Amino acid sequence: RFFAFQYGWSTFTIIQTAAISALAYVFAESLQSIVHLPEVLGSLSDYNIGNVFYPFKNFNVKLAAIILILLLSWINSKGLKLGAWLGTAILLLVFAGLFTIIGFGLTSHEANLHMAFSMQTTNSQPITISGMFTAMLAAFWAYQGWASVGYIGGEAKNANRNIPVGIAIGVFIVIALYLLVNTAYLSLLPISSLELINQPGNGIAAIEAVKIFWGRSGELFIAILILITTLGCNHVTIITSCRVYYAMAKEGLFFKSARQLNKHAVPENSIWIQCIWACVLVLSGTFDQLTDMIIFAIFFYY
């Protein structure tokens, strides 16, 4: 019970709310790359708290992220049926986009599958287990969604069977897509190019890979795909995470108001409490700061 209490509050303060904030931030940055967002409160951009947090820096992006969180929270407060319809539509669009990248990436004339499976490195240092683990650290966040399935166990039909099956199928799909997409990237971009892209401010590997066979239009395609993907992931994170605080509140471990259901049988107060804190986290830092907090907290409990 003690560790469950600790995990529940960590889920609220960092793990899930920071994930919501980070995903909304990526959505807003992708939107900024498509439609230039007007500057907001630019005169306050240098205001800081302890020379660490700059709440008004890139405030136009942060404001767009906050609006997205508010909108998705409102949609999810109107019932699971509306939320499920939106989630299904987004999922189909994401699959279509990913399979487009995989198909064109692996079959284009510029693709070199041998390069994708090469063990060549850009330095003389040997490949070690610790090095592989460090490289995979951020990638582990892609698999974190498996834990969220259990959050809605109380509302699932035949949960004892369907929850484990859903987790197994979901993780398998993520593994397959992750390997296929990265094979496409590696067949188009040599390791040296990926190393340069990984340096701060140099771009995104997906965009550079797609530009090889689609040119500048590929950049727009990836930006739109990132918009759709982060929208869908954020939607699911909001709809599942609030169930944790609802369950905690029923046991007296969270704010009492979070245990109340609205007329749609949804823990609306839990959703809005989560929404408020996620918006605060958006103002607190950048995408890198948010994801660093998430990964640290997640691995502590693993």
Regions found by a protein language model. Name each.
Residues 1, 33-42, 120-121, 127, ...:
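TM-loop-TM module centered on a large, flexible mid-protein loop between adjacent transmembrane helices
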Residues 1-69, 74, 226-247, 283-302:
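Hydrophobic transmembrane alpha-helices that form the core helical bundles
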Residues 28-36, 92-120, 140, 182-191, ...:
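Hydrophobic alpha-helical segments and their helix-loop junctions in multi-pass secondary transporters
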Residues 77, 156-160, 284:
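Helix-loop interface residues and adjacent transmembrane-helix termini in multi-pass membrane transporters
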Residues 60-111, 144, 167-171, 291-302:
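Membrane-interface loop-to-helix entry segments
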Residues 5-6, 23, 62-67, 92, ...:
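Hydrophobic alpha-helical transmembrane segments
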Residues 64-71, 104-105, 122-176, 181, ...:
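Hydrophobic, membrane-embedded alpha-helices of multi-pass small-molecule transporters
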Residues 42-53, 110-122, 194-198:
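Membrane-interface helix termini and inter-helical loops of multi-pass transporters
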